Amino acid sequence: MKGKIIKGIAGFYYVHAVDVGNTMGTVYECKAKGVFRKDHRKPLVGDDVEMDVLDEAQKKGNIRELLPRHSELIRPAVANVDQALVIFAITKPQPNFNLLDRFLIMMQQQDIPCIICFNKQDIDEEGKKEDYRAIYEQAGFRTITVSAAKKEGIDTIQELLRGKTTTVAGPSGVGKSSLVNCLQSGTVMETGSISEKIERGKHTTRHSELISIAQDTYILDTPGFSSLGLFRLEKEQLAEFYPEFAPFEKYCRFGGCSHIS
């Protein structure tokens, strides 16, 4: 049976398998075969796998094969991500553009397309949303504005996520959890015990987890956003990640200038 790893805790992997006649699927608690350790291969959240069901009633299984990956992120450690959705608030709190740019660069370094989502458009009293959208669309990023509180723009996000695995990130206070709740509204997996199984991991550091929100559509809630750091990058390389600045380079009379003053 084929499935996708949605969470890993303490050597257990939770595999989401879509059954015939059950589009929301079933989650099985699985162990990975020792051959993966021997081959120095570690299953990751997001991996597509072949599994054997050991106990259908208890939803237990074994992962016997890791299927080829089309992408692999290092931060967070996850496989087969198609795109990233980064969420900031238009206001309350004010967006930290330095943090946003760092995330965009980090995803570009790993060849992952990014969608920028500005939440809380319902309280945008200063009319900033069009300014923010223009800045990042000029840089080549798909940028949308929504309101989780008013459920405005949710259909747009759902359409952008359809049929893909998307890592979702954002600092605290921007309404990321509210948006995730809107996206997964009405999606219930067959097994009612998955939440109980995953409770075992409460004593551990928070893990990344894939959430199935529609058929073949997953979102990954990304922890640790505020402590983002870039991979090693020389300042001369930063220009590659700011294409919107390229048209102005010819006006600088200093060769090799970093344009920092």
Indicate residue ranges for each PLM-predicted region.
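Helix-rich effector regions associated with P-loop NTPase G domains
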Residues: 11, 24, 34, 39-59, ...
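Canonical P-loop GTPase G-domain recognition
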Residues: 122-174
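Phosphate-binding glycine-rich loops and their immediate beta-loop-alpha structural context
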Residues: 91-140
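SH3/SH3-like beta-barrel fold
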Residues: 13-19, 30, 51
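Structural detector for short beta-strands of small beta-barrel domains
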Residues: 1-10
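A conserved segment at the C-terminal end of the G1
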Residues: 176-192
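Catalytic P-loop NTPase motifs of RecA-like helicase/translocase cores
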Residues: 94, 124, 152, 186, ...
